[in-house]
Regions:
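Short amphipathic alpha-helix that is part of the acyltransferase structural core
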Residues: 1-26, 33, 133-169
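Structured N-terminal alpha/beta-domain signature
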Residues: 6-22, 32, 156-163, 186-188, ...
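A conserved beta-strand-loop-helix scaffold within acyl/acetyltransferase catalytic domains
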Residues: 11, 16-36, 41-59, 166-214
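Conserved acetyl-CoA-binding loop-helix of GNAT-fold acetyltransferases
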Residues: 61, 67-83, 220-235
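Conserved short alpha-helix immediately C-terminal to the canonical SAM/SAH-binding motif I
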Residues: 74, 99, 103, 227, ...
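Hydrophobic, ordered structural segments
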Residues: 79, 87-93, 99-119
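Conserved GNAT acetyl-CoA-binding A-motif
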Residues: 82-97, 236-248
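Active-site/acyl-donor-binding loops of N-acyltransferases
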Residues: 106-134, 237-280
């Protein structure tokens, strides 16, 4: 297997694994190819953050190629690219089960080290434990991202950039939109058609990872609740025994989930930071 930088010249080979905008929204986009079959078997997206640091945003290896060197080839190629461009470190933030797990062990075997100060609790809430109610103040129109056209998305992006609240957090949501579950991620518009919030998730089987929630306007708490309600209602119909997982860092959503479940969240994972430091 061979790792390679993904460019406009070879992007078509890898586009089946991610959306068409992934290349544009990645500072470094790497793929791995099985030379015998000329088949793409893995992709990795990284973003330049801070001072001379690359952050792994997304990594995927085809199930049939796992434990066969594809993942290691992706990381090795990323390390080579990082060295060539003068990066000082590569970082990866991820949720891991309590105790040891194979993915963390894989990163450690590739030379990464875990930040001893980084573990942050991740709590899970069964959707069956969530009790929803209508709130009279709810005025936002909430729509799943899979119903937002490319044109409407571009218009929303332009509107977001004019917000006083626009910052790196919202920019990160925008740039990584290709990697969210659009069926279970939502945008909100107020009664005048202005952007008022976004909730983004990723999924792994029955687990719905609440990646981030951003709300603005007169009552952002009501907007966040409206998007959470849309998530719960849609997930209940499309996922078997769904569970919402959220990091302790997202205190506003933890507070809201505790309120609608009667405090039934259970710690199931922890968020850790893994770092690879380049030789200088």
């Amino acid at each position: 297997m061979t790792g390679t930088l993904i460019t406009e010249d070879n992007a078509e080979l890898f586009m089946g694994a991610v959306g068409t905008n992934a290349l544009v929204n990645s500072d470094v986009f790497i793929g791995v190819v099985d030379e015998e079959t000329d088949t793409a078997c893995g992709v990795l997206s990284a973003e330049a953050v801070g001072d001379r640091t690359l952050a792994i945003r997304w990594i995927y290896v085809d199930e049939s190629r796992r434990r066969k060197g594809a993942g290691r080839e992706l990381i090795n190629t990323l390390q080579d690219v990082a060295s060539e461009i003068g990066a000082g470190a590569i970082v990866c933030s991820r949720n891991k089960p309590l105790g040891k797990d194979d993915v963390t062990e894989f990163f450690l075997s590739c030379g990464f080290v875990q930040d001893e100060f980084s573990p942050t609790p991740v709590y899970s809430y069964k959707i069956s434990d969530i009790s929803l109610r209508d709130i009279k103040k709810e005025k936002d129109q909430v729509m799943p991202l899979d119903e937002v056209s490319i044109k409407d998305w571009a218009e929303m992006e332009n509107a977001w950039k004019e917000l006083e609240a626009y910052d790196e957090r919202l920019l990160d949501i925008i740039q990584n939109r290709e990697f969210y579950d659009k069926n279970l991620s939502f945008a909100a518009m107020d009664s005048e058609g202005r952007f008022s919030g976004i909730l983004v998730t990723s999924t792994d089987g029955q687990i719905i990872y609440l990646e981030d929630v951003f709300a603005v306007g007169d009552d952002p708490g009501i907007t966040a609740y409206a998007m959470l309600k849309s998530l719960v209602l849609r997930a209940d119909k499309s996922v078997k025994d769904p569970v919402i997982s959220v990091s302790y860092e997202n205190k506003e959503m933890l507070f809201l989930l505790d309120k609608v479940t009667g405090g039934r969240g259970v710690q199931t994972e922890e968020n850790i930071l893994l770092s690879y430091f380049m030789d200088v």
